[in-house]
């Protein structure tokens, strides 16, 4: 009897120990899955060198008074820019011969493009800003700015770009040109809300701001943004007008010094527009891509399954243990009963 009791006790303990090992192993798999799955969607992101341009193209009208989109495209190609913010872009207007400038520029440069119309029914077409990009454009939206008075409608064109397995928010704007800065300052107050929609993304804010570095507008923007020219620009950086530039009113603003390192900034000479282009080379670290709905759904399913495995095994062990005890008791091999007899 004692021998049978010892054998029954050993068999039960062996099964329990084996069950505990299985539970521990499954818990390890669950932890491993929890650590591994989010990482599947966020690979290591290495910095990339970007060449960025902002350019008020004056509907492709040069200093000679001729509309010539090929001259604009040539300026862009020669700069080797990866991303371009364009202002004063016409689409199908009478004054430019009905040319679809955004589509034509995309064809001439071999880049992706999005267009933001700030004026509809203008000269039989549209007028606004555009963004050219060598990188895929994942989404874009043109925000019409509120105004304090009657005047030309202004806007902020934002595009989320897929850069080196990460993301960048690229923004183009063209603010009011009047001597009174009130409208420009009012426009600036609306920027915070627009960028809050993409708070997790590093951003570039480019365009024709129609104000100088000594202005109140520049002072306000400098509290949240970094002027690329102030980091690496040489000489005066004047961009307006192109024949004899006297003012710096075109800017490339950086949202964070953490994600951006400005290598150099330059103002190439050209007579293709009344503005000169502003070009910067920037070392950029993209933001990791956020996990999308399909990936989140997959993560939830997998983690649910992984969590269920140890629970199921534990339940099986408990049931098996109770069954073994019952069988041992019925056969007279219950270790507790055996021990009490000696």
PLM regions and their residue ranges:
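Cytoplasmic C-terminal tails of single-pass
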Residues: 324-342
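Surface-exposed cleft-lining segments at the edges of enzyme active sites
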Residues: 59-61, 142-147, 173-181
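Metal-dependent phosphoester/phosphodiester hydrolase catalytic core
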Residues: 162-184
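Metal-dependent phosphoester-hydrolase catalytic domains
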Residues: 160, 182, 195-204, 209-317
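Glycine-biased, low-complexity coil/linker segments
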Residues: 14-15
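Active-site beta-strand/loop signature of hydrolases that rely on acidic residues for catalysis
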Residues: 49-57, 72-98, 132, 159, ...
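N-terminal, active-site-proximal structural segment of metallo-dependent hydrolase catalytic domains
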Residues: 27, 33-108, 120-125, 286-314
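Structured beta-strand-rich core segments of catalytic domains in phosphoester-bond hydrolases
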Residues: 64, 83, 89-167, 264-269
